[in-house]
Amino acid sequence: MLFRSDGITYAKGASVLQQLVAHTGRENFIAALRNYFAKHAFKNTTLEDLLKELEATSGRELKPWVATWLQTAGVNTLRPEIEIKDNKYSKINILQAPPSIPVGSKELRPHRLAVGLYDIRGEKLIRRESVELDVSGASTSVEGLLGEDLADLLLINDRDMSYAKVRLDDRSINTLKTHIGKIEDELTRSLLWAIIWDMLRDAELSATDFIEILLSGLESETNISVVTQLGVQLHTAVESYANPKNRDALRNKASKKIYEILQRARAGGDFQLQFTRIFASLVTNEQLPELRNILNGNLNGLVLDLDMRWLITNALVERGALSESDLEAELSKDNSLAAQLAHAQGLASIPTADAKAKAWNRLIKEEISSAFREKIHLGFMRTTQRDLLKAWIDPYFENLLEMWGKKSYDISSSYVELCYPITQISQELVDKTNKWIMENDKAAAGLLRLLGEARDTVVRALAAQAKDA
């Protein structure tokens, strides 16, 4: 039996557990756990046993909490409603919207959370005040902050106590354009990075503003995992969510800034490696000499291991700065499996119709391992080659039923997801996908689901591009 693991389950599970701690109170929660373990040592228990102890120590009835948090789907959106008088808050309401998925949900959950006010002091963005409160229903007043001076940043779910989509007001967005990297607390920064990414994906923040915020704070970020994720998000923002009329300018801005950061990164460190990867993903034609220089070993301290050499080589190949013969020369230095996989990706990324046809035929007709298939997919579908890839829209749809019917699930599902012409973000692609689904509504449910998810990615990108117009 095939199933898809829902990654959100892990994130939501951790956040909901944290919300339970906040809802009952940390000390009450710990006391309840002590009682629970003492009472039920060496016995089997149920959720009800734990809830009884939590209710006893906290004084809160938890059955309604369990019903809404553990037995309903979707995530609520929380946004501020603010009124200012004499430069002070006369009104701060938290507006809660039901989940957009499942469609038709009216679920409004109780949240125990904090709202924080942050001020610019010197070069830093510092928390002035953070008040906890119970949020319920469609609107909740934050009474504890009324009369406070206007802050530079107002953050709902300060300290990450609940599970919700959070929105920022315009003043807070403008503050982040210059000061997201000036927040010393790593948790607060991570929260804000997640919030602006979600706002971008939901077309509530333009790609132009998102990129400005990201570039202002990226160099100051101290968590290498966050930097890695931000690099991926920056590429997606430029290539998928930016309005086409803004894309080239934003790519130039991003790549120049990343190169500046790379020049300042500590030699031989993890951040230098990661900024090199980000630079290679965004490099413009004007910067190809700089990238070639890096490949030639002219960036102080950078370790050019096999992975890094191939990453840079393939970035140059993708942009027409290196040829197939250069790929062969690189492979001759190391014929390991990792090198062969990178070589296969490079061949598929050559910006010619002939190279794309060869890669497509390998994906469609040849029996190749999943590892090689993934690399060829990756090389074939390059956002820098949009015009070249237009020719493969119709063949994709023409081969859907045959690939699904004759290939293994692993191969057929990767074809549906990875060969979908995602570089062609347009209403025409959405319409073409909808038309295929309508005409083939008796096709396998798994195929239709995967295709619908791919289409929804384009719908999301179109909305983001419209926001960036």
Model-derived segments and spans:
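Non-catalytic accessory/interaction domains
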Residues: 6-8, 13-19, 23, 27-30, ...
